[in-house]
Amino acid sequence: MHTPSRQVVSNQPYLHPRLAEVVLRHLRAGYEKPVAPHSAAAFEQLLQALAAAPRPLVLDSFCGTGHSTAALARCHPQHLVVGVDKSARRLARHPHTAATDYLLLQADCADIWQLLVAHGLSVDYHYLLYPNPWPKAAHLQRRVHGHGSFPLLLRLAAGGTPGCIELRSNWQVYVEEFGIAMHLAGVPGRVARLPSGPALTLFERKYRDSGHDLWCYSSIARR
């Protein structure tokens, strides 16, 4: 019998008071940091896969064990779905497969975003499914929307638009903050409860089985 998952506990019950300040500062500054060698090596795997079979891309950032990446490949059969996670331990739990419709990379997500932008590679769909919520108020800048790499996320589709982005979390505040950050960047979208359906990730299944409310932000690119 599985132990129920705990709800997110935070000393920040509402939107962070410095959210707009932090997001706007990052949007003005942009982002450029040295890419870690292991991330650069992982990106070469992606370039090789595209050279062998050119396809549009779907990105599954913070993919964990890659369960979601395989599921997304079934949803996007005309794309190469790329799952990225920094943890070799988590990725090692993915069942061995000879699948060619998805690729798992051990790399820092911000590094991969930076390399995609630098190489002019666009992403049609970008999924951020249950990233670490960093629930302490002091950790705002560790959250996706509070991190310095947030501007890269906005440049991952053709024409410099963010493509179709979907973020899910079991912490409503996190999703609402992400939605506001996207709005500040000029990208329309909506926040809503996630409707019932097959779980895309193992966390999603566990949270739903534990009775958590699940939340989703979705954005449609303006082509």
Label each region the model flagged:
Residues 1-57, 67-74, 96-119:
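S-adenosyl-L-methionine
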Residues 61, 84:
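Conserved beta-strand/loop positions that form the S-adenosyl-L-methionine
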Residues 62-66:
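Class I SAM-dependent methyltransferase "Motif I" SAM/SAH-binding loop
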Residues 87:
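Conserved SAM/SAH-binding beta-strand->alpha-helix loop
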Residues 145-160:
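A short glycine-rich, Lys/Arg-flanked "PGG" loop and its adjoining helix->strand segment in the class I
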Residues 161-169:
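Conserved beta-strand signature within the Rossmann-like core of class I S-adenosyl-L-methionine
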Residues 175-223:
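Class I S-adenosyl-L-methionine
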